């Protein structure tokens, strides 16, 4: 189960950057926003979308748009390719901690007899 989840999340991490740019472009087209209209804004920066509806610069965070669009929340930060190593480490840490906690719970259930102190 966890191996399957790990494989799926790894694939999402590889595909996510492509989907992010496509989702932002689709969002811009749907809201009639032209990209890179303002010459003072650097191409590729986070402030590169201009709203034609009210004529002011819209600050758009591409990653936030993608997170909100897919409902991933802050977990998406671990799925970015540059953080993939950290994500794998966190996943392994989580899996091993979960296994240790499970074993401790089982041991507590097996030995429900209270441990007495020696002097009593």
From Swiss-Prot:
Q: Name one GO cellular component term.
A: host cell nucleus
The UniProt comment on domains reads: The RxLR-dEER motif acts to carry the protein into the host cell cytoplasm through binding to cell surface phosphatidylinositol-3-phosphate.
Protein name, as recorded? Secreted RxLR effector protein 29
Induction behaviour: Expression is up-regulated at later stages of infection.
Keyword Secreted carried by entry:
yes
Q: Give the signal sequence positions.
A: 1-21
Alphabetical UniProt keywords: Host cytoplasm, Host nucleus, Secreted, Signal, Virulence
Species name = Plasmopara viticola (Downy mildew of grapevine)
Q: Where is this motif: RxLR-dEER?
A: 47-64
């Amino acid at each position: 189960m966890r191996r399957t989840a790990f494989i799926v999340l790894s694939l999402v991490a590889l595909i996510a950057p492509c989907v992010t740019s496509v989702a932002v472009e689709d969002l811009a087209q749907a809201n009639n926003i032209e990209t890179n209209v303002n010459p003072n804004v650097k191409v590729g920066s986070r402030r590169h979308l201009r709203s034609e509806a009210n004529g002011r610069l819209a600050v758009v965070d591409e990653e936030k748009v993608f997170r909100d669009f897919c409902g991933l929340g802050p977990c998406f930060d671990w799925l970015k390719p540059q953080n993939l190593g950290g994500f794998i480490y966190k996943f392994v840490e989580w899996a091993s901690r979960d296994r240790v906690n499970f074993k401790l719970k089982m041991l507590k259930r097996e030995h429900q007899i209270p441990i007495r102190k020696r002097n009593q």
